Amino acid sequence: MLFDQIARNKRKTWLLLLVFFLLLGLVGYGVGNLWLGSGFGGLILALVIGFIYVVTMIFQSTNVVMAMNGAREVDEQTAPNLYHVVEDMAMVAQIPMPRVFIVDDPSMNAFATGSSPKNAAVAATTGLLAVMNREELEGVIGHEVSHIRNYDIRISTIAVALASAITMLAGMARNMMLWGGGRRRNDDDRDGSSGLEIVFLILSLIAIILAPLAATLVQLAISRQREFLADASSVELTRNPQGMINALLKLDNSAPMQHHVDDASAALFINDPKKESGLQKLFYTHPPISERVERLKQM
């Protein structure tokens, strides 16, 4: 089952790349048509920006994500309890020892990042370390180590990179609309516009407006099942389902994180870091804690 999931995650990586780059291309086409005088030129520019974001995140994902979340690296001397739990879980999972970080925040949360098990990292908040006992902490870290072992972190890294690129490009386009409007075409340009070009332009304008939401929905589509699998994989590592259940119940009562969490990286956390309510719940990248607990009870 595990190796099948790893293979599926690798296939999802390519599908994720395709969906995000298609969305980037639409946004770029709209930007090019409206402001650069060439839809194709804008499309190429957007794809180049997306490629740069992905390459940067693949090689610098740990440093970038940790900096985004204000995490500091620790070792066996400065955080022995966390370090030893990560070390134990990595040994059981048969992966290289990840780098270990702490986020100074009173809420309870944790996440993993990196592009492969060889350059992965795990982070936990000070609030998590203060509240969780050893068994619960093992459950949480086992969950994050499972993301590393199952290659979920590669999907997450690419998702963060491309979602950030889409949000940045769409934000720039919307600001240009507000401040300057589109490039004015002369009558000859309008008369020569093909029906297909107009269709692409309309789709691009829609993409510019809805791109950040679409990026979130793509992350949502790939995130929820990964969380269920990581919960189950954590129990496989710890042989202690009750420890994972107790940890999830505590996470359910945690307050939102106090420091700002970028929308693109929110899906990395074991627990929703924003604790939003109302209609925003529809766009959670995490399944409900109650559902995760119920699945563990059925194991």
UniProtKB/Swiss-Prot annotation:
GO BP, one annotated term: proteolysis
Record keywords: Cell membrane, Hydrolase, Membrane, Metal-binding, Metalloprotease, Protease, Transmembrane, Transmembrane helix, Zinc
Cellular component, GO annotation: plasma membrane
Cofactor details (free text): Binds 1 zinc ion per subunit.
Full protein name: Protease HtpX homolog
Binding site for Zn(2+): H143, H147, E227
Enzyme Commission number(s) of this protein: 3.4.24.-
PANTHER family, sorted: PROTEASE HTPX (PTHR43221:SF1)
Topology with respect to the bilayer: Multi-pass membrane protein
Keyword Zinc included in the entry's annotation: yes
Cystine residue pairs: none
Organism: Streptococcus thermophilus (strain ATCC BAA-250 / LMG 18311)
Catalytic residues, chain numbering: E144
Record-linked Pfam families: Peptidase_M48
NCBIfam families: PRK04897.1
Protein's cellular compartments: Cell membrane
Cofactor(s) needed: Zn(2+)
Protein origin, superkingdom: Bacteria
Signal keyword on record: no
Listed transmembrane segments: 14-34, 39-59, 153-173, 198-218
One GO molecular-function entry: zinc ion binding
CDD domains hit by this protein: M48B_Htpx_like
Family to which this protein belongs: Belongs to the peptidase M48B family.
